[in-house]
Amino acid sequence: MQPQVLLSSLLPLSDYISGWSWGSLLGNQPCPPLPAGDLVMRKYQMYPENFMWDKKRCVAYVSNLYNATLSIYDPYKSEVIDTISFPGLSHPGDSATPNPLHTSGLILRPDAATADLLEIVVDNGDCFFSNGNNVSGPDYLLTMDLRTKKVISQIRLNDISNGTYAGYADAELASDGNSYVVGTYVSNILRVTPQSEVSTFFVQEPLGPPREYGYTGLAHVGNVLLSNDNIAKQLVRFDIRDEKGTPVFIPQTPYHEFTTSNVMNLPEKYNNTILLAAENVTPDHPSGGVAVWRSRDQLYNEVEYLGFIPSRLTNALATAARQMSDRIYVVSVYTDGANITVAGYSSEFVLQDITVEVDALVA
């Protein structure tokens, strides 16, 4: 466990300014750089699974898996400054029944630099615990006003499938202005318009059962939507200009096999040329890590596999790697609960800084 990260001496006012004040203080200026080293999020039974960096307010929004809540984290103080519960959805994390909902995918609208809205995927945990046997939902896409921290929209995602596919795990805002929500059992991608219209962009036939562990992450650049097919063990791409998506495998050189790939991301600092995908676990790394690919032309017709960065944690599953300010961090779900379906009793959760490792692979 790394010591708490303190704000650089270049920012002496930090002790007097809350995380929510940074946006009004900095205006359109970039968020201050973060010092090298791991960060620690301190919140009882938090169990973070994903995060999204708000460049307007210089805070991170963190989806807390087991209790279906959202935390707001100020990395400059290494402090969880707020945790938001959603009435009728959030619940105690150490009990998977009667309502085992999770928070997972996150989207900032209209973008990370000017965000006023946050979209949050709330998924049915039993779909994952049952290995895809229960695809009945409920699964939701919430929209929260960041100024009031109130939910202004709640869309049920299961109506479009009539309970035949689900497993919603992540979401991505694409260049067409639509939100795309990825489902795992069976592999499917929903398209959600700003007017809250939901359609199926892609679904893998047959619908089953049985249902295998399929797509789990999304990323996009231009008109290209990327995902990770854990069944085929391949990266895939879609063209969002199509009414119905057709997956195309992306050749890798050399080929990197994966079966537990999770959240995907194109860090801003590499100008969309680097793709990161967290993997929960691998044969050589029981706590998983992060796979790194490169597409020099940003088109992702083919990719160069650069290498794998193992997680340094134990009893945890790597779930998401993203950029926060100028650095890259990995969040992992801790597995110290009675079983994989419930939270344990931890209060400290490490965000691993892998900036140096990614830079070394990219160099």
Swiss-Prot record:
Entries under SUPFAM superfamilies matching the protein: Calcium-dependent phosphotriesterase
Entry's family note: Belongs to the TRI14 family.
Described purpose of this protein according to its UniProt entry: Part of the gene cluster that mediates the production of the antimicrobial trichothecene harzianum A (HA) that plays a role in Botrytis cinerea antagonistic activity and plant defense priming. The biosynthesis of harzianum A begins with the cyclization of farnesyl diphosphate to trichodiene and is catalyzed by the trichodiene synthase TRI5. Trichodiene undergoes a series of oxygenations catalyzed by the cytochrome P450 monooxygenase TRI4.
Annotated protein name in UniProt: Trichothecene biosynthesis protein 14
Naturally occurring in which organism (per UniProt): Trichoderma arundinaceum
Organism ancestry: Eukaryota, Fungi, Dikarya, Ascomycota, Pezizomycotina
Gene: TRI14
